[in-house]
Amino acid sequence: MKASDLFVRCLEEEGVVYIFGVPGEENLDFLESLRESKIKLILTRHEQAAGFMAATYGRLTGKVGVCLSTLGPGATNFFTAGAYSQLGAMPLLMISGQKPIKKSKQGRFQILDVVEMMRPITKFTKQVVHGNSIPVLVREAIRVAQEERPGAVHIELPEDIATEECSAQPFEVISPRRPQPDERAVTQAIDMIRSATRPLLLIGAGANRTSTCKALSMFIEKTGLYFFNTQMGKGVVDERHPCFLGTAALSTKDYLHCAIDRADLIINVGHDVIEKPPFYMEQGTAKVIHVNHFFAQMDEVYFSHLEIVGDIATSIEHITEKLEPGKNWDFTYFHRVKHEIDEHVEDKSKEASFPVIPQYLVDQVRVVMPDDGIIALDNGVYKIWFARNYKAYSPNTVLLDNALATMGAGFPSAIAAKIVYPLRKVLAICGDGGFMMNSQEMETAVRLKLNLVVLVLRDNAYGMIKWKQAGMGFQEFGLDYGNPDFMKYAESYGAKGHRVEQTDQLNEMLQSCLETPGIHLIEVPVDYSENEQVLIQELNAKTCVL
């Protein structure tokens, strides 16, 4: 068969359902093979958005998301999405085209060494140099992308190789088994937890697997340990649980850090140092048990005292089975901290001033979203408010990036979420800056006939940087911009545009749009003056003597 046919057959064998991308001239043989396959092509308006969609597909399903681009400028547009996937531990395969490698009459036109360009942001990057190697390369790329820690891989398919006749056949897919934990480490962890006075559980993104969610819920029910999570660990355990303290949206000086500072043992499950630190460790403070699929990456703010490496769910199940509550456990202080956190989150959540303040916005979104509804956040200061104040009830219902923390990923991620879960409510929440970085995908969403709501928070500036600029004592400079008429902008794509002009419209507008088919964009003017007042002044003035 033709090499491009073989490539697509290999992807089918691996269970690939969608390919997101923007094909070019060098992909035409591959595109023809794709036309005759069961795999559905999701044509996007920019390769970066295709990569974000594919990475999010990987995050939500555990399967490898696949995206396609041409050579040169198409492949370079993948780069940010590849880094997003690699740092965020989302399985992603990027396929790029290339000019003929055996005989080309176009000189160096559009040619870059894409394989080497991808090396720093991938786990695996290869060029196909003969068609019969395709089954090996595809199988290895998929395996590497999915194995812990998941991430990005890349294969380059040159134009002339795609036309070769091949005799090779796809490999049979073998499901790998994750390594089991060392029982001696499990026993040592049980002893450390039992002998601690104020053990505290931290849940990170690595725990966001179905089996691990169940295991952690059982662990918490049996022990009654209080827990908190990182931003990317939101929803692993239902945050309505009475033992939930909060999310580490800030690295220091939040109410949550009072509990962290008082803990004498932190059981760190699935956290990855690639996330912005949920706390800063110092020598002589609480001991840390690191439970993950891989060994801890030590740095000056994170170092573990015991490591349990292997399948996280199995590790937690073994601990739960043998652990009995410690005689010296005292969670009184944690209970008081939880009360303070809950009060602070509730404060101003009903304050219907205009423009809308973040606390009210978060509260209203939580009110209208169903338990399994998904919010996809872009990057901006509002992400801190949602991470901190929005309670997630189920795994992967708050999609955010706290690793690369790139702008422009929120809306494409929401599109991918709606493709994966067509019957669930999905809400993209973007700042005006982040939305405009990939707003062209409005056309993609409309063309796919999705039912999706986009909340655009308008402050006409790069608000996060503006806040930091003011905090450093600098004058305002270089961060303000204009915006289109978002209602007309949405309508120009065939979507429905809405604008909140007084705060009491927000709840009804959100509910109506979530229940009405089609693509809806809601423009919401926001007041970020609360950033300085609450996240800096109030938290700096608080005391941990509760």
What do the predicted segments below correspond to?
Residues 4-7, 12, 27-35, 338-412, ...:
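Active-site diphosphate/adenylate-binding microenvironment
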Residues 132, 285-381, 501-512, 516-546:
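Phosphate/pyrophosphate-binding active-site segments
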Residues 365, 377, 416, 432, ...:
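Hydrophobic, well-ordered secondary-structure elements that form the walls
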Residues 1-329, 364, 368-371, 444, ...:
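N-terminal alpha/beta PP-like core and its mobile active-site loop of ThDP/TPP-dependent enzymes
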Residues 409, 413-450:
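Catalytic phosphate/nucleotide-handling subdomain of diverse soluble enzymes
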Residues 34-42, 59-66, 389-403, 471-473:
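Glycine/charged-rich beta-loop-alpha catalytic/anionic-binding loops adjacent to active sites
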Residues 110, 447-538:
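Thiamine diphosphate
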Residues 46, 106-107, 176-188, 248-252, ...:
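A general structural motif
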